[in-house]
């Protein structure tokens, strides 16, 4: 957590330390409003309002004092710190990027070992098949996917990860900061569809994992990978499988029976439950 705290001005970092950081999933910073720590059970509001200089301080530290080098990420509305932490950025959209930044959402990653273990008997019952992980934003899709990758890799599967935003592996100095298992190869930074084709050509995966599939070209890459006999693991924002079917791109893929199973994540009263659905 020291890597997270170092992003904040000292007075803010000190105030944050008085609260349970191990339970904190997001820190919200909005100019003129109190800092808010978001946990699975609710929000904790600090007495300190975020100043414009605070946001500048956070972004400078997060970018290693090179905002220019992070322009591509900022144009997409986020900044990746290199330790698995992703900072969502909100401000004024211009032709050249994002300016006058007014709020930040600092997502704090957590590795929860064996959270996917109870699901393995159902997911592997007929051999591993392509699986969606489905939930609303912030319910723990990435955490579950990360642990599922690790467990499959430990179990002997060759897993390749297209980690476009660096959240799954948090590769730093060529080494993942999260344990993804001994048989996992990670492609970081490139688009998911480009990474998919490169991994298929070079790493001979049995399993391909993606986080947050949204673009049409990503769907095309998954179709191609499935045609090569590779099992897919992917996450999607939706309340459940039924709501996923209302979106044309997902509905097409589901109708093609490329994905045979889904895991729904439900969050109620701070507790996560998982439900495996056969598609």
Where are these regions (language model features)?
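Conserved lysine of the Walker
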Residues: 141
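Hydrophobic anchor at the beta1->P-loop junction of P-loop NTPases
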Residues: 133
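Conserved P-loop NTPase
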Residues: 94-100, 260-279
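Conserved P-loop NTPase nucleotide-binding/switch module
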Residues: 203-261, 267
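N-terminal accessory targeting/assembly segments
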Residues: 1-83
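P-loop NTP-binding catalytic core
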Residues: 67-128
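P-loop NTPase switch/communication element
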Residues: 152-197
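Hydrophobic positions on the alpha1 helix immediately C-terminal to the Walker A/P-loop
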Residues: 144, 148
């Amino acid at each position: 957590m020291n890597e997270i705290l170092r992003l904040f001005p000292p007075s803010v970092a000190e105030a944050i330390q008085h609260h349970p950081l191990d339970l904190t999933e997001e820190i919200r910073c909005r100019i003129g409003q109190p800092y808010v720590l978001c946990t699975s059970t609710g929000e904790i509001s600090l007495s300190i309002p975020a100043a414009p200089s605070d946001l500048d301080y956070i972004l400078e530290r997060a970018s290693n004092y090179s905002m220019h080098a992070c322009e591509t990420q900022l144009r997409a509305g986020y900044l990746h710190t290199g330790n698995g932490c992703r900072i969502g950025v909100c401000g004024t959209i211009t032709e050249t990027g994002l300016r006058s930044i007014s709020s930040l959402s600092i997502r704090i990653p957590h590795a929860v070992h064996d959270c996917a273990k109870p699901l393995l008997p159902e997911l592997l019952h007929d051999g591993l098949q392509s699986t969606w992980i489905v939930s609303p934003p912030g319910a723990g899709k990435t955490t579950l996917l990360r642990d599922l990758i690790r467990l499959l890799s430990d179990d002997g599967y060759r897993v390749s990860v297209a980690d476009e935003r660096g959240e799954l592996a948090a590769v730093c100095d060529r080494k993942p900061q999260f344990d993804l298992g001994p048989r996992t190869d990670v492609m970081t930074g490139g688009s998911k569809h480009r990474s998919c084709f490169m991994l298929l050509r070079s790493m001979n995966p049995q399993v391909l994992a993606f986080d947050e599939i949204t673009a049409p070209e990503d769907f095309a890459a998954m179709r191609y990978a499935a045609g090569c006999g590779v099992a897919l693991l992917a996450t999607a924002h939706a309340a459940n499988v039924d709501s996923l079917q209302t979106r044309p791109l997902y509905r097409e893929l589901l109708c093609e029976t490329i994905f045979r199973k889904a895991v729904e994540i439900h969050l109620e009263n701070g507790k996560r439950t998982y439900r495996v659905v056969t598609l």
